């Protein structure tokens, strides 16, 4: 198994090659730039033959320029290199939110999904729900006695959060499970779907505190988007910030569950589950200091 990684990987480029090697023990590590077709071919594939390609590549912020460069074009380069290397099957980590593609990064992901499906190679397109790290930004503030922030009532959305380990196992199983070949696969973690308010209630219970919530109106995000969108016509940097605000609004108002088009609603029962670890387990580890949470761009609050 060969892993193609950046020379400085991790959040903020904190991981040197030796750090990456320890995290990926047992794999052959190759360093390069996944957005550069020549680097991918010469430093990644190196003219060798491979059976499969597994890609977890994604833009960090979802801003339009990054999204089209990474979620789409870098994958197009990888697909071309994979074909040259004799790859027969591609496992792609996508995202469940592409069901309703209102944002640039969702459109970029969908564009590559279509390219992969039309490529003639075997594929497994995995669309996970929310990640634990994306839902863990308020642990420290609640430990400090502050209220848990929710948009609206805290019941506008729901999801089936999935752990990194459970998702990783699911991705790996796509290589040799024929039932997952040539399919688009939505997947969530174990248990019932939970709302942001329920997430807060779990956290308060773990910390032995009475639940306290502060409601943030969705209209506040609308106002921010309007101001930044208008200013962004003059200042490009503000246009990028407007897109980030749109991303925040999307996650504040859209559930990470399978969309039932016929019923025009999200449906937890249609959202498959895998794994054993729950968000409550993760919160317990964070609350007791048994785990840390490097969210980086995976945060709203």
Where are these regions (language model features)?
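Oxidoreductase cofactor-interface core, primarily capturing Rossmann-like NAD(P)-dependent enzymes
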Residues: 6, 16, 85, 99-211, ...
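Short, amphipathic alpha-helical "lid/cap" segments that border enzyme active or binding sites
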Residues: 79, 164-172, 276-284
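Short beta-strand segments at enzyme active-site cores
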Residues: 88-94
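A hydrophobic C-terminal alpha-helical subdomain
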Residues: 219-301
């Amino acid at each position: 198994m060969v892993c193609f990684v950046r020379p400085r990987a991790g959040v903020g480029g904190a991981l040197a090659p030796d750090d990456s090697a320890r995290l990926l023990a047992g794999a052959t590590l190759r360093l390069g730039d996944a957005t550069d077709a020549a680097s991918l071919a010469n430093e990644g594939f190196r003219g060798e033959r491979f059976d499969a390609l597994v890609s977890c590549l994604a833009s960090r912020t979802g801003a339009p320029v990054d999204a089209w460069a990474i979620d789409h074009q870098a994958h197009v380069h990888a697909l071309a290199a994979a074909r040259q290397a004799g790859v027969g099957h591609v496992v792609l980590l996508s995202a469940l939110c592409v069901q309703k593609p209102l944002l640039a990064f969702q459109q970029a992901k969908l564009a590559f999904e279509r390219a992969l499906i039309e490529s003639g190679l075997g594929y497994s397109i995995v669309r996970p729900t929310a990640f634990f790290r994306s839902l863990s930004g308020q642990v420290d503030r609640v430990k400090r006695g502050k209220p848990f922030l929710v948009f609206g009532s805290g019941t506008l959305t729901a999801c089936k959060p999935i752990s990194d380990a459970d998702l990783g196992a699911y991705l790996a199983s796509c290589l040799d499970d024929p039932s997952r070949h040539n399919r688009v696969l939505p997947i969530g973690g174990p248990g019932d779907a939970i709302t942001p308010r329920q997430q807060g209630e779990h956290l308060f219970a773990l910390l032995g505190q009475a639940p306290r919530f502060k409601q943030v109106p969705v209209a506040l995000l609308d106002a921010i988007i309007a101001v930044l969108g208008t200013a962004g016509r003059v200042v490009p940097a503000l246009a990028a910030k407007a897109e980030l605000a749109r991303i925040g609004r999307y996650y504040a108002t859209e559930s990470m569950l399978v969309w039932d088009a016929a019923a025009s609603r999200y449906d937890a029962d249609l959202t498959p589950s895998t794994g054993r670890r729950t968000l409550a387990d993760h919160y317990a580890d964070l609350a007791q200091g048994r785990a840390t949470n490097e969210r980086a761009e995976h945060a709203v609050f």
